[in-house]
Amino acid sequence: MKVLASVKRICRNCKIIKRKGVVRVICIEPRHKQRQG
């Protein structure tokens, strides 16, 4: 899980979702998981 100020899609499987007010990227590739912080 990367904590970044700016979350971006890395590949076409990445999905940007908002969960409890936190912007996250979920993907089938575990290394692409991100959270805005």
UniProtKB/Swiss-Prot annotation:
One of its GO terms (cellular component) is ribosome. PROSITE patterns: RIBOSOMAL_L36 (PS00828). Transmembrane segments: none annotated. One of its GO terms (molecular function) is structural constituent of ribosome. The keyword NADP does not apply. InterPro entries: Ribosomal_bL36 (IPR000473), Ribosomal_bL36_sp (IPR035977). The keyword Glycosyltransferase does not apply. Keywords: Ribonucleoprotein, Ribosomal protein. GO terms for biological process: translation. NCBIfam families: rpmJ_bact. Belongs to the bacterial ribosomal protein bL36 family. This is Large ribosomal subunit protein bL36.
